[in-house]
């Protein structure tokens, strides 16, 4: 339904909405007089957007706007459209972009969140923006910095998620709000609208064709088309792929989440990975999808790679508090998910990541999980998982209840069911590591909670089932090469293997010993190279 070839069909004009923000300013700001600094900023912001001065737009967007928000609008809304319009000569495009920031600020800063009317108006404003750029027969004359384009798409998906949760919470709605939701605005923040927009941006930019051409060593410009040659459309298309990854993850469709990224070589850096928050968000959702698909090795590699990247580049974005908060939270979430994966699928990881796990006392909880503590598994999952949503709202005749947690509870049940299947595998692994041969009856007696009882046929059968489960769970699809994150080969993730011959278990240790020589050789060569460079500078 949403293929790359499907043309943009508009589809939003039929809603018949009003373009203004009625009473937003009156409701949130109490008609405070606009500060002179804010007036000058808005007029200058409009001018540089008209002139397409990207570096200055980025400076105003990343530095001045957050600074003014802290100084004048920390707990209240920015000026309404009506207050701003006369300052910018009613520039329609600027007002659309300004309202995007206005509603984003409402979602982030206003206690209790935006009202229903503000949520609806925010959706309509996004419709205006996408209707401005998508149906156009030629590229629009608009240049915005990549960071704004990324955060615009990211915020678009976030507000969809936020509205889905708001709509599922029926207990705090008035009769008037329920009537507005059920009768007048059934298509607002609809999942099909979100998918339609994101797929249309991907299609218009031909970003998939460009990525495939680049991977094949060809010129992406040759397949980019009229729109895809422009950085504005190309980057919107790329960020929309990441947006689709997030949407499908929120819906619990992990296979499709990875599939939409097929042109992107997830495990390689590219020219598009220059926005830290985009790269981190991509790795978070990819790693989580891999974990839920029981591809633990791929999840561990994804999390380890991005956590190393964060360690090395944190100083680049630490000064930007509005990005730093989100990055810090996702970093903590990924350490929790990595801990889960390492318990379910033990393997070696980078020493610096291990050090963080030790310093932050993850090892205590990891030990509890290895001992089968289901509560720790659940708590880690609830903290680290995305905020799942249902693709459809509660039916009109549904009882007045809070349905927000339904989607989360479903995903928790799926995850915990998998954990319960593996609950005793760490114990089996610990016993097998001690022997090269082990009689089945002896292992059965070790596993028996009541050692004074004799091992009967039923207990023996249960043990054989667990051993078969061990074999099965340790075999996973692992990505090896190619642009599709779904491809891979079956590999054993365990450090030991075994087979059963009659009543005897034969165990082989398959652990590869560390080659410390290679590590020291690389470090010596790196030091020598650094020494040569220092001597060259002195000379």
From Swiss-Prot:
Keywords of the record: Cytoplasm, Initiation factor, Protein biosynthesis
Superkingdom, taxonomy of origin: Eukaryota
Gene Ontology terms: biological process: formation of cytoplasmic translation initiation complex; translational initiation
Domain PCI: start-end pairs: 302-514
Location within or outside the cell: Cytoplasm
Transmembrane segments: none
GO terms, molecular function: translation initiation factor activity
Major subcellular location class: cytoplasm
Family from the record: Belongs to the eIF-3 subunit L family.
Function (record text): Component of the eukaryotic translation initiation factor 3 (eIF-3) complex, which is involved in protein synthesis of a specialized repertoire of mRNAs and, together with other initiation factors, stimulates binding of mRNA and methionyl-tRNAi to the 40S ribosome. The eIF-3 complex specifically targets and initiates translation of a subset of mRNAs involved in cell proliferation.
Assembly and interaction partners: Component of the eukaryotic translation initiation factor 3 (eIF-3) complex.
Full protein name: Eukaryotic translation initiation factor 3 subunit L
């Amino acid at each position: 339904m949403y293929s790359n070839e499907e043309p943009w069909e508009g589809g939003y004009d039929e809603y018949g909405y009003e373009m203004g923000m009625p009473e937003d300013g009156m409701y949130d700001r109490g008609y405070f007089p606009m500060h002179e600094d804010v007036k000058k900023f808005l007029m200058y912001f409009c001018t540089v957007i008209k002139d397409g001065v990207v570096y200055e737009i980025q400076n105003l967007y990343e530095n001045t706007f957050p600074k003014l928000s802290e100084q004048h609008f920390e707990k209240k809304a920015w000026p309404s459209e009506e207050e701003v319009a006369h300052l910018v000569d009613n520039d329609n495009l600027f007002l659309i972009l300004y309202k995007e920031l206005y509603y984003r600020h409402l979602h982030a800063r206003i206690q209790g969140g935006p009202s229903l009317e503000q949520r609806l108006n925010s959706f309509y404003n996004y419709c205006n923006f996408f209707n401005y750029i998508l149906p156009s027969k030629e590229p629009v004359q608009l240049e915005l910095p990549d960071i704004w384009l990324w955060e615009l798409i990211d915020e678009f998906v976030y507000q969809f998620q936020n509205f889905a949760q708001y709509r599922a919470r029926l207990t705090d709605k008035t009769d008037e709000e329920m009537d507005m939701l059920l009768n007048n605005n059934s298509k607002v923040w609809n999942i099909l609208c979100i998918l339609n927009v994101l797929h249309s941006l991907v299609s218009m930019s031909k970003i998939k064709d460009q990525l495939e051409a680049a991977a094949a060593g060809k010129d992406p410009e040759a397949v980019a088309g009229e729109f895809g040659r422009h950085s504005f459309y190309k980057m919107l298309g790329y960020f929309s792929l990441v947006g689709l990854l997030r949407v499908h993850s929120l819906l619990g469709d992990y296979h499709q989440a990875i599939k939409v990224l097929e042109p992107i070589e997830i495990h390689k850096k590219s020219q598009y990975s220059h926005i830290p928050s985009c790269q981190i968000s991509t790795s978070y959702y990819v790693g989580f999808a891999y974990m839920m698909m029981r591809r633990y090795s791929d999840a561990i590699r994804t999390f380890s790679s991005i956590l190393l990247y964060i360690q090395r580049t944190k100083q680049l974005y630490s000064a930007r508090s509005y990005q730093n908060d989100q990055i810090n939270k996702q970093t903590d979430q990924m350490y929790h998910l990595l801990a889960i994966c390492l318990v379910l699928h033990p393997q070696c990881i980078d020493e610096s990541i291990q050090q963080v796990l030790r310093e932050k006392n993850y090892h205590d909880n990891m030990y509890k999980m290895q001992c089968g503590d289901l509560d720790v598994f659940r708590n880690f999952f609830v903290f680290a998982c995305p905020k799942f949503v249902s693709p459809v709202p509660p039916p009109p005749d549904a009882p007045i209840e809070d349905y927000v947690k339904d989607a989360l509870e479903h995903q928790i049940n799926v995850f915990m069911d998998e954990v319960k299947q593996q609950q005793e595998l760490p114990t089996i692994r610990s016993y097998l590591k001690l022997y090269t041969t082990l009689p089945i009856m002896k292992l059965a007696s070790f596993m028996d909670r009541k050692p004074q009882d004799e091992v009967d046929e039923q207990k023996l059968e249960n043990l054989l089932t667990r051993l078969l489960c061990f074999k099965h769970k340790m075999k996973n699809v692992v990505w090896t090469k190619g642009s599709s994150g779904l491809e891979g080969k079956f590999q054993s993730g365990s450090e030991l293997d075994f087979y059963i011959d009659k009543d005897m278990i034969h165990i082989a240790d398959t652990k590869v010993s560390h080659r410390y020589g290679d590590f020291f050789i690389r470090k010596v060569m790196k030091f020598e190279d650094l020494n040569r460079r220092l001597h060259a500078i002195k000379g």
